[in-house]
């Protein structure tokens, strides 16, 4: 026995009820308040779109309210340019890749630039245009940028630092075209004697608040060969000063046993711009792994040392005939046009750990592959190099192809995206006049950070001045 129970048609009942309500509203408002009817139907039909609009507006305004609370300098560095990078990429850059300090904070720091006789600086540029454009020309660029900088003071009594503009890397007297440093120590010693005779500031602090540039192989040791650099060491009269040098390692080394800042080598900004303008229109990089430079098939034993510790020779022998490796031992003036076509740019050590390839590859969008154990990269406290480069141990150079293939299959696109951020290019290039966030600006930031640590020296100087008065 079964009961045949018919369920009421709920849907139809609801529809009729709804229709009845609407009819009542229509009848009650006929010839009267038609606006209420419009509002009712508008919200009934478009409430989903209205809800999405309100939520979007909320998240949009919340994003910018958070942005306003971020580092002002980081925002300015990123807001002055248009970028096609995604929001996650931008967040990565702002949070970790570049840590910056607002330029306004530099207003409390003053630098006095000595007006030395031209024989210490300008005469070298007059003798050779290369003095202001070759890879060691940071000494010229920094000097020129400081002359027009807001931190410069014409009153030495209010200075926190004293900049000594001596160009030691412009003596192009060698047969290979590289500058000789044989005169560097005597030229610097002569400059210090001049300061001691004509100004009271060097003697007052023993040079501890004076800044020099050493933009060549082994920095403050002023020698191109490491064994000789170590043997001669840092000139005694400079051991209390601050050295801006391209040489830097993470381990103890006689040539950096002085207060110093590791800076990038000089690359002319105009040459970078020209290379970018001549890059393939489609942005295609048809060279997978690139290196052009000195590579010895049979490296010579020079005082027990081999050029590049044999790393470049190992690269040549292992990958010289490989299709995906573009290796060339000969010089080519237009080699930057090859960098903009390359995915990976090999940066092995030479006699010294650093090379201009580090900067050239990074600013031209080619991933720098650093092969130099223990190297200290420029501005490592502010520029997060792991975000824009690879590091391969010297002992692993024979596995280089596998390393690059792994990166290409995993995080290559993220590294390339970071490299395209203008903040990186700006941090590694020198401009005259200085631009916020460029290489000279980061040098000033490093000096500014040192002020607290050096405040006792400043107070000591002021106390001594009062005694003298």
Swiss-Prot record:
Keyword entries, A-Z: Cell wall biogenesis/degradation, Glycoprotein, Glycosyltransferase, Golgi apparatus, Membrane, Signal-anchor, Transferase, Transmembrane, Transmembrane helix
InterPro entries: Exostosin, Exostosin_GT47
Main localization (coarse): Golgi
Cytoplasmic membrane side: 1-36
Known glycosylation sites: 171, 203, 301, 411
Enzyme class: transferase
Function: Involved in the synthesis of the hemicellulose glucuronoxylan, a major component of secondary cell walls. Probably involved in the synthesis of the glycosyl sequence at the glucuronoxylan reducing end.
Family: Belongs to the glycosyltransferase 47 family.
Protein name: Probable glucuronoxylan glucuronosyltransferase F8H
């Amino acid at each position: 026995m079964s009961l045949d129970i018919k369920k009421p048609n709920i849907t139809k009942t609801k529809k009729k009820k709804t229709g009845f309500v609407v009819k009542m509203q229509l009848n009650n408002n006929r010839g009267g308040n038609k606006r209420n009817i419009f509002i009712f139907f508008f919200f009934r039909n478009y409430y989903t779109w209205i809800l999405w609009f309100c939520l979007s507006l909320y998240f949009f305004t919340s994003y910018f309210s958070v942005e306003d609370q971020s580092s002002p300098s980081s925002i300015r560095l990123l807001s002055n340019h248009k970028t096609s990078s995604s929001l996650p990429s931008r967040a990565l850059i702002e949070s970790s890749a570049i840590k910056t300090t607002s330029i306004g904070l530099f207003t409390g720091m003053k630098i006095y630039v000595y007006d030395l006789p031209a024989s210490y600086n300008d005469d070298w540029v007059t003798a050779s245009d290369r003095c202001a454009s070759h890879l060691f020309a940071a000494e010229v660029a920094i000097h020129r940028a400081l002359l027009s900088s807001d931190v410069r003071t014409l009153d030495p009594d209010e200075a926190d630092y004293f900049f000594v503009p001596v160009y030691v890397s412009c003596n192009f007297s060698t047969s290979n075209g590289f500058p000789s440093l044989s005169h560097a120590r005597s030229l610097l010693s002569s400059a210090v004697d001049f300061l001691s005779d004509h100004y009271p500031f060097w003697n007052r602090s023993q040079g501890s608040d004076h800044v020099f540039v050493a933009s060549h192989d082994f920095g403050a040791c002023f020698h191109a060969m490491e064994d000789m650099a170590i043997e001669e060491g840092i000139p005694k009269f400079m051991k209390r000063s601050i050295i801006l040098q391209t040489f830097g390692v993470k381990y103890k080394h006689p040539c950096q046993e002085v207060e110093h800042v590791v800076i990038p080598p000089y690359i002319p900004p105009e040459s970078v711009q020209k290379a970018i303008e001549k890059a393939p229109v489609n942005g295609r990089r048809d060279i997978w792994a690139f290196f052009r430079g000195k590579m010895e098939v049979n490296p010579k034993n020079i005082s027990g040392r081999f050029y590049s510790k044999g790393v470049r020779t190992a690269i040549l022998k292992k990958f010289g005939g490989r299709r995906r490796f573009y290796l060339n031992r000969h010089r080519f003036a237009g080699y930057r046009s090859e960098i903009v076509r390359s995915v990976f740019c090999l940066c092995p050590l030479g006699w010294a750990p650093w090379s201009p390839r580090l900067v050239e590859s990074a600013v031209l969008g080619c991933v720098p592959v650093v092969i130099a154990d223990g190297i200290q990269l420029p501005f490592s406290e502010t520029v997060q190099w792991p975000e824009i480069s690879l590091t391969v141990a010297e002992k692993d150079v024979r596995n280089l192809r596998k390393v690059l293939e792994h990166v290409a299959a995993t995080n290559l696109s993220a590294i390339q995206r970071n490299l395209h951020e203008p903040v990186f290019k700006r941090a590694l290039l020198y401009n005259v006049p200085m631009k916020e966030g460029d290489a000279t600006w980061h040098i000033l930031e490093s000096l500014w950070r040192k002020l607290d640590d050096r405040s006792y020296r400043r107070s000591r100087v002021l106390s001594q001045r009062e005694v003298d008065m």
